[in-house]
């Protein structure tokens, strides 16, 4: 008799995705981040569910309800900090996952890549709305500043912002709808992640060489199941070290002050994982230009398959492209640092140079390097 996992309609799907899936024999730890993102998402949904049981989405009680969770609810503090720092781990894994895709040319799987970009946007939107919920100073002013960016859209901008706010400023209506959206979005992300996986399994995984691995496949289980479990343990270890030793390391002290529309904090800045985009936004002295640059800084990922001029898929055997890739990483770290600094000399000019460098590297230098590398070899 055939094994039930191969015949049962539901188990068959699980079997083909996680057990008998043929996988390349040489995929490195950079291929662990997909499963880690899945674990992060499940963790966020579970901790978020328990937080939602005690949270109230009302301007008068939101801040107090978060305080209540931390002080009075059994293990509420650990649930709250696991959720807040879980978001940081989520974004670390996301950036690593995208970086892996860029380095090894995984973006040539167009459908998988484009759904990945949509997933990135959806995750960023979810994180932004979640940051508003505790209704601290940075929550309120962050929401005000970021939603206000939409007013830069010609003609419909102002109406659009007021429609999103549900009034003439960020208020009760805004908080309530953000809570509703923050609750539903992770499930949309989970659904999209399944489509992401569906498209990936149409082609199979890429591997570090960028060459077809059809001639040398191994079963996903036990080889990569055990590898994913190791990755998961390391992820949870890192998260728990953060949660139990320095839970407020990545947060903003201003968010421990209740939201006050009459008092603007001296430095409005988002969570660390948005700082690179925030720096790009601020580096352009025009509102609409800044908003366009902000959107394009992420949307540029969609162009990656079109900008691929190399005859090799992966950067593994392309030293010039490797150098430029790591310069891009350093540039993004520079932008992240600048995004957290006040708008004054020398930070303004550093931010502008780093922003120019970001777009220049992706749009001009990397495609040029690929062309040079093609000509260095006999094909």
UniProtKB/Swiss-Prot annotation:
Its membrane topology: Multi-pass membrane protein
Residues noted as binding heme b b562 in the record, renumbered to the chain: 83, 182
Entry's localization field: Mitochondrion inner membrane
UniProt: heme b b566 binding residues: 97, 196
UniProt remark on cofactor binding: Binds 2 heme b groups non-covalently.
The keyword Transmembrane is assigned to this record: yes
Molecular function GO labels: metal ion binding; ubiquinol-cytochrome-c reductase activity
GO BP term (any one): mitochondrial electron transport, ubiquinol to cytochrome c
Domain of life: Eukaryota
Cofactor dependence: heme b
CDD domains according to UniProt: cytochrome_b_C, Cytochrome_b_N
Residues at which a ubiquinone binds: 201
Chief location bin: mitochondrion
UniProt keywords, alphabetically: Electron transport, Heme, Iron, Membrane, Metal-binding, Mitochondrion, Mitochondrion inner membrane, Respiratory chain, Transmembrane, Transmembrane helix, Transport, Ubiquinone
Entry's transmembrane regions: 33-53, 77-98, 113-133, 178-198, 226-246, 288-308, 320-340, 347-367
UniProt xrefs under PROSITE patterns: CYTB_CTER (PS51003), CYTB_NTER (PS51002)
A Pfam family hit: Cytochrom_B_C
GO terms for cellular component: mitochondrial inner membrane; respiratory chain complex III
Stated role: Component of the ubiquinol-cytochrome c reductase complex (complex III or cytochrome b-c1 complex) that is part of the mitochondrial respiratory chain. The b-c1 complex mediates electron transfer from ubiquinol to cytochrome c. Contributes to the generation of a proton gradient across the mitochondrial membrane that is then used for ATP synthesis.
Family under the similarity heading: Belongs to the cytochrome b family.
PANTHER family linked: CYTOCHROME B
Remaining remarks: Heme 1 (or BL or b562) is low-potential and absorbs at about 562 nm, and heme 2 (or BH or b566) is high-potential and absorbs at about 566 nm.
Summary of subunit composition and partner proteins: The cytochrome bc1 complex contains 11 subunits: 3 respiratory subunits (MT-CYB, CYC1 and UQCRFS1), 2 core proteins (UQCRC1 and UQCRC2) and 6 low-molecular weight proteins (UQCRH/QCR6, UQCRB/QCR7, UQCRQ/QCR8, UQCR10/QCR9, UQCR11/QCR10 and a cleavage product of UQCRFS1). This cytochrome bc1 complex then forms a dimer.
Protein name: Cytochrome b
Source organism: Cephalophorus weynsi (Weyns' duiker)
Encoding gene, per UniProt annotation: MT-CYB
């Amino acid at each position: 008799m055939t094994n039930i996992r191969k015949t049962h309609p539901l188990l068959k799907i699980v079997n083909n995705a996680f057990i008998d899936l043929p996988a390349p024999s040489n995929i490195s730890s950079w291929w662990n981040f997909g499963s880690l993102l899945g674990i992060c998402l499940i963790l966020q949904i579970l901790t978020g569910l328990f937080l939602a049981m005690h949270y109230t989405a009302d301007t008068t009680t939101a801040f107090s309800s978060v305080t209540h969770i931390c002080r009075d609810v059994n293990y509420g503090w650990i649930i709250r900090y696991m959720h807040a720092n879980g978001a940081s781990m989520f974004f670390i894994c996301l950036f690593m996952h995208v970086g892996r895709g860029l380095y090894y040319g995984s973006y040539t799987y167009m459908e998988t890549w484009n759904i990945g970009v949509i997933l990135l946007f959806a995750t960023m939107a979810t994180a932004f709305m979640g940051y508003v919920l505790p209704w601290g100073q940075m929550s309120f002013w962050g929401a005000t500043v970021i939603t206000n960016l939409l007013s830069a859209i010609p003609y419909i901008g102002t109406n659009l912002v007021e429609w999103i706010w549900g009034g003439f400023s960020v208020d009760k209506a805004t908080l309530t709808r953000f809570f509703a959206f923050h609750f539903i979005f992770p499930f949309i992300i989970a659904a999209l992640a399944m489509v992401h996986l569906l498209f990936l399994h149409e082609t199979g995984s890429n591997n570090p060489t960028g060459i077809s691995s059809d001639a040398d496949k191994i079963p996903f289980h036990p080889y990569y199941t055990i590898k994913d479990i190791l990755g998961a343990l390391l992820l949870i270890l890192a998260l728990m070290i953060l949660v139990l030793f320095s839970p407020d390391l990545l947060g903003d002290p201003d968010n421990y002050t209740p939201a006050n529309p009459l008092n603007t904090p001296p430095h409005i800045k988002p969570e660390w994982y948005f700082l690179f985009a925030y720096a790009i936004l601020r580096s352009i002295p025009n509102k609409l230009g800044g908003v366009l640059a902000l959107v394009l800084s992420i949307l540029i990922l969609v162009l990656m398959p079109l900008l691929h001029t190399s005859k090799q898929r992966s950067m593994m055997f392309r030293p010039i492209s490797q150098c430029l890739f790591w310069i891009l990483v350093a540039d993004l770290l520079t932008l992240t640092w600048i995004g957290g600094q006040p708008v004054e000399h020398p930070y303004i000019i550093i931010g502008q140079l780093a922003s120019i460098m970001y777009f220049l590297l992706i749009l001009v230098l990397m495609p040029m390097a690929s062309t040079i590398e093609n000509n260095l070899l006999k094909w």
